[in-house]
Amino acid sequence: MVLNEVFREYLEEAIGKDNSLVAFSAFERPASSSVRINPFKSGPVPEGREVLWNRHGRILAQRPVFTLDPSFHGGAYYVQDSSSMFVGHVFRQLVKPVIADSGNAGPVRVLDLCAAPGGKTTDLAVSLREMLGYRFVLVSNEVMKQRA
């Protein structure tokens, strides 16, 4: 892969020569495929190794043809890059102490203003339901019409 020289120099300066070489070599490898399993649906899901920061995430050994899989269309899993699943991990770590302190103060309210296409929103919904049952309100909105 041919990378822009300005980008190469910037990355070397930002993270150091050794780390930038690791990043540049990653650009040469095929992209990984990962899915997030919907724990509230049933059906066969692709097997893979667990994403460290999301117990419902799986990194696949190879990319299947998702559009031919009825479980995909039935919502048993969502195709999502493992790096996007990290947002849910951060959310869970930040919200746990808030929930512990709130007791029965009423439903937890969450507003997602960058909601399209919906992968991170559904990850938040699963996390909230696992932590709170149905004691939450999640409002998702996408302000950019072309993304919605």
Give the residues covered by each predicted segment.
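S-adenosylmethionine
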Residues: M1-A148
